[in-house]
Amino acid sequence: MASVDQSQLCSKSVSMSLSVDDGVQRRTGDYHSNLWDDDFIQSLSTPYGAPCYRERAERLIGEVKEMFNSVRLSPLNDLLQGLSMVDSVERLGIDRHFKNEIKSALDYVYSYWSEKGIGCGRESVVTDLNSSALGFRALRLHGYPVSSDVFKDQNGQFACSANTQTEGEMRGVLNLFRASLVAFPGEKVMEDAERFSAIYLKEALKTVPICSGSLSGEIEYVLEYGWLTNFPRLEARNYIDIFGKDTSPCLQTEKLLELAKLEFNIFHSLQQRELKQVSRWWKDSGFSQLTFTRHRHVEFYTLASCIAIEPKHSAFRLGFAKLCYLGIVLDDIYDTFGTMDELELFTAAIKRWDPSATECLPEYMKGVYMVFYECVNQMAREAEKTQGRDTLSYARNTWEAVFDAFLEEAKWISSGYIPTFEEYLENGKVSFGYRAATLQPILTLDVPLPLHILQEIDFPSRFNDLAASILRLRGDVCGYKAERSRGEEASSISCYMKDNPGATEEDALNQIDTMIKEKIKELNWEFLKPDSNVPISSKKHAFDILRAFYHLYKYRDGFSIANNETKSLVMRTLLETVPF
């Protein structure tokens, strides 16, 4: 297991003087306090770091590989069996052990793929909805060129023969729904498939008593989380529960489930060690004294460990958690707490990038600046180990753009200015910080990102532009009322209404929702397009960061209100083990 010198990773403690008694009237966001006491976090323990659990997992990995190899023995259902194996190991979060087996299985399926899809086996003479839908989704997610025309009839219209509600048919429609969520722009048949399958599945849950516990749980989960609010460790945690509800498990299911539970709990022991470091960094750096900001260091580490679930990616998880936490502190300084004079000084200090730049800053900003400075520098050193080049200037340019966007929004707040929708979004997709949150962490991964590949992921690529726009728009939908109550008038909603006199808030929200849906399809294309110069594996973590952030906006602004669904996410994926 690769390790990082944790004593060096953004860990320098800076004593902050945070008493602000200068007579200046300051706004605050009135956020709830930190939910995770450092003493509680330091007391966490688990037995799953013991070697015996790793040894048992390794034996099971070998047995599952043998299961992959035996799939092709039956010509009547080998395609469906292979796809089901791929689907299961991916959803259980154990696919990293079977990359060669997954590629071999998908190459085999693709060799039998036709314009009408596939049957259950290589000798099947009739195509099968479940096999075709599962195959379409898996092949598209792995970059194979497959057309959605497989779901059309001879007249070019969406066609589905599902008219009963047997368990087999429901599973086929479920996988059709899952396939429809990875639609590309212009695929109307996939829109029709999504509409049909969603209605069918919701009705099935209400009316069909024969639906097994595992299938009903699977349907409920997919309808709830879909594609963009789902991400690896969250899906693994929930799918383990669903898998465990199978009333007639076979030996294959039992082995997969045992391995998934072991891997989940073994990784949990690593999560605990890293979480303790993040919490101690937060406490020792003096952030616990900040009363005006959102303390979400534990939540950001949770997201990081739900995205990067390979043990060797420790630098990604720790760096992402700390950079995102610092980003949210600085966002609160610019949006509410800081005065315009202070913000101008801080922005200038960032561009100087020198500890001596703190001399002109107010006391409460000095410590924040120094911790931020050390963290960005150390992340650049970590990136140099994997990329073989100095990326600090790249990171600095990224953050300078964010602070310029922060400052522009602060000016709007101060003056009450509401820009045009285009002006707002152009600035807002930078100020959201997606690019800054993504760039340095992905550079620490063991995936080479030469400049020509990085340019396809980072700004100003279409991929980055779409991801940042989606997050800014979704964030506004969830948070514009709270921001307006704090005197922050500019949002995509208010800007749309300004551009379109007579438009209501409902009109604006409907239009923005439509924009988000279209941008998601475009992003699917940028992420999954076949024959790209950039492998999907190089874009995956950047895409999963988008999904993690988008997840926090599923019900409300989960960055600001973290004591509901966000707290549940922390408990289920970070603090609790899976029972055997």
Swiss-Prot record:
Organism this protein belongs to: Picea engelmannii x Picea glauca (Hybrid white spruce)
Similarity remark: Belongs to the terpene synthase family. Tpsd subfamily.
Cofactor(s) demanded: Mg(2+); Mn(2+)
The protein's name in its UniProt record: (E,E)-alpha-farnesene synthase
EC number per UniProt: 4.2.3.46, 4.2.3.106
Binding-site list for Mg(2+) 2: 331, 335
Catalytic activity: (2E,6E)-farnesyl diphosphate = (3E,6E)-alpha-farnesene + diphosphate; (2E)-geranyl diphosphate = (E)-beta-ocimene + diphosphate
Keywords: Lyase, Magnesium, Metal-binding
Gene Ontology terms describing biological process: diterpenoid biosynthetic process; green leaf volatile biosynthetic process; monoterpenoid biosynthetic process; sesquiterpenoid biosynthetic process
Single GO molecular function: (E)-beta-ocimene synthase activity
Domain observations: The Asp-Asp-Xaa-Xaa-Asp/Glu (DDXXD/E) motif is important for the catalytic activity, presumably through binding to Mg(2+).
Claim: Lipid metabolism is one of the keywords in the record: no
Pathway recorded for this protein: Terpene metabolism; oleoresin biosynthesis; Sesquiterpene biosynthesis
